[in-house]
Amino acid sequence: MGNLSTPKSVQKLQTALHAKAKAEAGYRFYALYDKTSREDVLAHAYAQCRSNKGAPGVDGQEFADIEAYGVQRWLGELALALRQETYRPDPIRRVFIPKANGKLRPLGISTLRDRVCMTAAMLVLEPIFEADLPPEQYAYRPGRNAQQAVVDVEALLFSGHPEVVDADLADYFGSIPHAELLKSAARRIVDRRVLHLIKMWLECPVEETDDRGRKTRTTEARDNRRGIPQGSPISPLLANLYMRRFVLGWKMLGLERSLGTRIVTYADDLVILCRKGKAEEALHRLHEIMGKLKLTVNEEKTRICTVPSGEFDFLGYSVCCRRRKERRATANGVVKLHER
């Protein structure tokens, strides 16, 4: 979000929420909905969405349209809809983005109104759930990034974890079960109106346009009761919230100690670093736990790698570990770890 700074009033709110969550692990927040419609929160949410730019949703509305109408007027109407509980999200416009491997990745584009509302909710909820996320999770978190995740993977390889379960989850975002995700949210959030907002966003219809310009709408997320749309402002937070279940489950079962393992996750990218001779058992337990979470391990893409004889890719980095590494950018800008 560039140099966009958070207003002091919003910072104060976020600091108080985070401090309360950090101090009381069992505390459940009961009065949050009104905070999402606060003038300062909505204004900052709009500024964030504006700085991120992005294409219009199904209604075709662009930021220029809002500014011509009057931002304060537009935000005031959104705040009123939230307070009167008449707000309803629009369908999500689905587009397909080419991936490096030639396949297409679905991306959900919400309307600007919904993006601002989701961002406002994220501004309120993120400080609470951030207090609960374990250090093994690196994605979408303040002060953490992909390079830190790779650096820590490298450090673990050098500290006696030479076997790696390089895991791939089949359609993680599209597979997250709504009921279980909402249970994870309700562990901290009592405010039924906030939970209802999340539920509405999860169940949004999806609109696609074919090559002939014909539009079709589906309700697969609501019908299947699973999946969070990639591309929405609140999806990263929800994805982290559900992955937390796996990380905590692994620890609660004593697998970190008994198998000598360490986990590093970045969204749906996951590696389990193991003591020698423990990777096979770790892979078995991975399948077991993910099955209980109603997630699927992609067997074709999940493998065991032993360093220094092998290497694996993680977050656009090629990791190999025969000697100390140096980092350099390749021609396409992807940074890799190479042997010195």
Q: Predicted segment positions?
A:
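Non-catalytic, polymerase-adjacent accessory regions of viral genome-replication enzymes
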Residues: 1-72
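Short alpha-helical scaffolding segments that buttress acidic/His motifs in well-ordered protein cores
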Residues: 45-49, 120, 197-202
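Short beta-strand-to-loop capping motifs
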Residues: 67, 111, 272-276
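Active-site and adjacent loop segments of nucleotide-processing enzymes
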Residues: 317-340
